[in-house]
Amino acid sequence: MKTDLTHVLDALVDRKAVDPVVLDLRGLSGATDYFVIVSGTSAAHVRGMADHLVTALAPRGLKPHHVEGLAQGRWVLLDYVDFVVHVFHPELREFYQLERLWGDAPVVAAGDDGGSQ
């Protein structure tokens, strides 16, 4: 699983993901093991990161079980069953505060801010 998460983060950071975080939900949620949470800078950026992630993971045999929000580009949810990727527009990430909602979940990875340079 760690290898899959590494590929997820690499693909998102490659597309300038902002504030990437991975939460370990094992023991806290029966729905999934990990949340990967990132932000984009615009709806186009959010859609582009989500599209790139699906394309980048496909050769590894990883395909999302379900995708929500791609057309709008405000909050794209990619459900890979063992992990769920949330790609947010900044305002929605701040509004929903998943990191705070799941505050008991250990942060197992947090990357550099790919969007600042």
What spans do the regions from the language model cover?
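Polybasic/polar functional segments that serve as interface/processing modules
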Residues: M1-T32, G40-V76, F88-R93, L98-Q117
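Active-site beta-strand termini and strand-to-loop segments that position acidic
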Residues: L78-Y80
